[in-house]
């Protein structure tokens, strides 16, 4: 990467004299990474050489013939059996013809198409965004067997579609359903057969009498001494399991009640000959490094359909590095209006149900509408919420609800009352749908004044005009045979779901040449050149919007390190779009989105947790503009100075120092804290200035207090972190960009894509700010944190901050809840109980749960 971040190692003055930083860790870490790369390259097979014989075994575990699938409509064949000398990314796909305009992903089964036979961006992007797989990675060199492939089952999809009822024992479960070994669970002595059957029924939204299914009875007959099952027994088992989950949560919370705040006890200083500052610092660091934060929790508040509200618990699974959530309670609201007193009453009822919760929760995340009212009322006499052991509860606005309010009204004229803070009414689950289908119901929204309304009018006119319709079908047929069915389906467009709207825009983008050709034959309003351009821009923006929603609603860790930077990058993305349009009419919806997004940014800049997250976003030190935007300066010294105050304020919520003996002697505490550690940003990162004032050269003259002691420790650790990032960031960018065929000219990232014939006729394009964020900066930041978490060289304060950020929730809207709207009837008798069982089963290891005396954290 040709950037000003190169050669930073020589510009940093470290804390080696204070024995805080060991530079050998950086070099060894980098060396190890290169060794791992070499090993990977040795293991990677050269697919171009192997593919010369289509019948040859490409792997000792996978045969190409085993991957051929007949879905009843097409025969899907591994690409290397259709074409020779192809790029490695093709090994991840199946196709039905040599043009490769339509392929099926081996990992998830999704069917992808491309409009131009020379473009492969769609396929490469799918591998990266959906599966986090580099386009340079050979499918056959990956560490799995054919049994792991989503395409192993060759059963015809049409045959499956024709099956009805439960006699077939075909489960249409969502992807989060966790399969488990009934035999193993039975042997654990914690769950009876009736409970196991209840888990299956609740997890799959099956009727209570599902156990009467002939095939299921046959399965149960394989076990000995099966007790008789009735509908009442299953119902009682579901209720009993739900109560057991509640008790499991109560036990887990009660343990936190005894831990918060974390007490750091200092030993008696009278018998020590060490300077008081050094003695206390070492004791505090030793105890900070041993703090167990794995049992901390936060609370999410979400609105469901039918005037129902859901409170859920969120924790961080340190083993699998993901956040997980469990429902606590569902409350029924009297009206759809937002009433903060009603919300507080619900919260108090929640505390009554889970007595330890009030003293153990560290933050609450709310939808945008509720968050605003909480801020307005938190200082009023009527707002009686007490945070318990945590000195100041942190409230966070749900970023997903913020994005929904920013985008939906300007683009689709969605009225505010139609934008539920969370999930819309339950409706049929559509295959290939979007998470956004469960967040907003478009069926009653008037799109006539939007660009989608124009498209619908145009399609309607084509449908009514036999001549135009005939020309359209002929165009689709000549366009490309595999895509014919998909493109012609636009004639029966349905705009009741987000995924349907997105599909219409995607198909229309492929049909622009046809609609341009018939413009002069249209009786109604035709589309102008600016309209066609607007359609392409809206389609691209919606893809980015959907990707953003799915990311922040996911279980990915450390999303708080991305929120502020993400919003600023989206602001830049929208600004570029607005500048590219000449006409006010085209600019208007994007200007509305931008105005709303700027308000969200201002709100997030007031949140200490978001500021801490931004500081801990490694890639922020790759951009002076980001530092200026968030911290108001590019001076690392000033940034660290301000962040030290913020971190101190935040950590004092959770840490209590006891047996501290203050010192009135400034000389005892007056030391060089990290002397000559760090110069300014320009000297460290940009190599433009060496004449800077070092904050760390100053000596402490004030009396030693608890706060001044913590300030020294926090500042030292923040500086150690910056030093570490400055060593690792250039290498991380260099390696990642090389691996993904991306170049950087100092201001723009350019993606270089090989054609399907490999080296010849390669293409390239400049990445927009959001593509940079999702395709470059977030993966690099996550990689740096993965390396940090797995290393032994930890930084105490940074480690604590990361654990706290992992527990806090950026969004109260979680993707695992989206399946509830597809099949869940909230009016049924066992709705809350079923939801609890379903989400427990989908996220936790049931084999590890002791429902009698265990904790929810034991099941991670």
From Swiss-Prot:
Q: Which UniProt keywords apply?
A: Metal-binding, Nucleus, Zinc, Zinc-finger
Q: Where is this region: Disordered?
A: 19-45
Any one Gene Ontology cellular component term annotated for this protein = nucleus
- Disulfide-linked positions: none
Which InterPro entries has this protein been placed in? Znf_BED
**Which phenotype arises from disrupting this gene?**
Exhibits cold sensitivity, a significant increase in cells with fragmented vacuoles, internal accumulation of precursor CPY, increased glycogen accumulation, and displays elongated buds.
Q: Name one GO molecular function term.
A: zinc ion binding
Residue spans, zinc finger BED-type: 84-138
- Bias (Low complexity): 20-31
**Has keyword Nucleus?**
yes
Functionally, this protein is described as follows:
Involved in vacuolar processing and morphology.
Q: Family, per the entry?
A: Belongs to the VID22 family.
Anything else the record notes?
Present with 1050 molecules/cell in log phase SD medium.
The name on file for this protein is Late endosome and vacuole interface protein 11
| Gene name for this UniProt entry | ENV11
């Amino acid at each position: 990467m040709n950037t000003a971040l190169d050669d930073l190692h020589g510009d940093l003055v470290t804390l080696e004299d204070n024995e805080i930083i060991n530079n050998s860790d950086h070099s060894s870490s980098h060396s190890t990474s290169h060794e791992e790369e070499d090993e990977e390259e040795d293991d990677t097979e050269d697919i171009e050489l192997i593919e010369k014989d289509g019948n040859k075994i490409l792997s000792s575990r996978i045969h190409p013939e085993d991957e051929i699938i007949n879905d009843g409509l097409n025969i899907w064949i591994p690409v290397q059996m259709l074409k020779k000398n192809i790029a490695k990314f093709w090994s991840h796909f199946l196709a039905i013809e040599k043009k490769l305009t339509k392929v099926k992903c081996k990992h998830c089964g999704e069917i992808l198409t491309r409009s131009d036979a020379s473009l492969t961006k769609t396929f490469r992007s799918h591998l990266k965004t959906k599966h986090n797989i580099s386009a340079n990675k050979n499918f056959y060199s990956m560490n799995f067997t054919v049994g792991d492939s989503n395409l192993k089952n060759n059963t015809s999809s049409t045959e499956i579609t024709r099956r009805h009822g439960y006699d077939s024992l075909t489960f249409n479960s969502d992807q989060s359903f966790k399969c488990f070994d009934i035999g193993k669970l039975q042997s654990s002595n914690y769950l009876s057969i009736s409970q196991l059957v209840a888990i299956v029924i609740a997890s799959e939204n099956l009727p209570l009498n599902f156990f009467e299914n002939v095939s299921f009875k046959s399965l149960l007959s394989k076990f000995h001494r099966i007790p008789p099952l009735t509908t009442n027994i299953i119902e009682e088992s579901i209720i009993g399991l739900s109560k057991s989950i509640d008790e499991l949560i109560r036990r887990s919370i009660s343990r936190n009640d005894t831990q918060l705040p974390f007490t750091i006890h200092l030993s008696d200083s009278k018998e020590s000959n060490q300077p008081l500052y050094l003695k206390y610092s070492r004791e505090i660091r030793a105890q900070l490094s041993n703090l167990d934060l794995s049992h901390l929790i936060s609370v999410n508040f979400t609105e469901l359909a039918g005037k129902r509200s859901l409170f859920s618990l969120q924790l961080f699974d340190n083993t699998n590095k993901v956040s997980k959530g469990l429902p606590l309670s569902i409350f029924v609201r009297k009206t759809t209006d937002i009433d903060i007193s009603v919300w507080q009453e619900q919260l108090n009822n929640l505390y009554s149900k889970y007595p330890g919760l009030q003293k153990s929760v560290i933050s609450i995340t709310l939808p945008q509408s509720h968050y605003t009212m909480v801020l307005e009322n938190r200082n009023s006499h009527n707002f009686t919420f007490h945070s318990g052991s945590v000195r100041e509860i942190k409230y966070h606005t749900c970023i997903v609800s913020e994005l929904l309010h920013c985008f939906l009204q300007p683009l689709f004229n969605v009225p505010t009352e139609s934008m539920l803070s969370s999930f819309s009414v339950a409706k049929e689950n559509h295959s290939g749908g979007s998470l956004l289908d469960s967040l907003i119901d478009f069926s009653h929204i008037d799109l006539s004044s939007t660009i989608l309304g124009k498209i619908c009018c145009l399609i309607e006119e084509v449908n009514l005009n036999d001549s135009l319709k005939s020309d359209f079908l002929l165009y689709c047929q000549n366009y490309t045979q595999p895509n014919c069915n998909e493109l012609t389906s636009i004639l029966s467009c349905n705009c009741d779901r987000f995924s349907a709207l997105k599909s219409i825009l995607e198909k229309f983008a492929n049909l622009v040449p046809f609609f341009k050709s018939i413009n002069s034959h249209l009786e109604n309003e035709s589309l102008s050149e600016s309209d066609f351009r607007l359609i392409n821009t809206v389609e691209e923006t919606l893809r980015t919007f959907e990707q953003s929603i799915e990311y922040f609603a996911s279980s990915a860790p450390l999303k708080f390190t991305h929120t502020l930077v993400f919003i600023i990058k989206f602001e830049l993305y929208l600004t570029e779009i607005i500048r590219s349009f000449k006409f006010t009419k085209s600019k208007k919806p994007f200007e509305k989105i931008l105005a709303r997004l700027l308000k969200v940014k201002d709100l997030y800049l007031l949140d200490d947790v978001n500021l801490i997250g931004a500081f801990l976003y490694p890639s922020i030190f790759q951009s002076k503009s980001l530092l200026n935007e968030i911290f108001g300066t590019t001076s690392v010294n000033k940034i660290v100075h301000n962040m030290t105050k913020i971190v101190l304020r935040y950590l004092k919520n959770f840490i209590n120092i006891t047996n501290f003996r203050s010192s009135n002697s400034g000389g005892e505490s007056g030391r060089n804290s990290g002397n000559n550690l760090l110069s300014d940003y320009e000297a460290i990162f940009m190599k433009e200035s060496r004449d800077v004032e070092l904050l760390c050269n100053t000596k402490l003259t004030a009396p030693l207090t608890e706060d001044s002691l913590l300030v020294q420790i926090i500042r030292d650790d923040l500086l150690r972190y910056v030093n570490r990032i400055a060593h690792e960031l250039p290498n991380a960018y260099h390696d990642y960009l090389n691996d993904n065929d991306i170049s950087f000219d100092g201001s723009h990232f350019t993606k270089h894509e090989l054609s399907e014939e490999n080296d010849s006729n390669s293409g390239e394009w400049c990445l927009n700010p959001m593509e940079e964020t999702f395709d470059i900066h977030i993966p690099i930041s996550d990689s740096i944190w993965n390396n940090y978490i797995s290393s032994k060289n930890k930084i105490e304060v940074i480690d604590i901050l990361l654990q706290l950020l992992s527990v806090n929730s950026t969004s109260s809207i979680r993707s695992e809840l989206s399946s509830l709207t597809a099949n869940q009837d909230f009016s049924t008798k066992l709705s809350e109980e079923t939801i609890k069982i379903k989400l427990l089963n989908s996220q936790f290891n049931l084999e590890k749960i002791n429902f009698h005396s265990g904790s929810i954290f034991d099941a991670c």
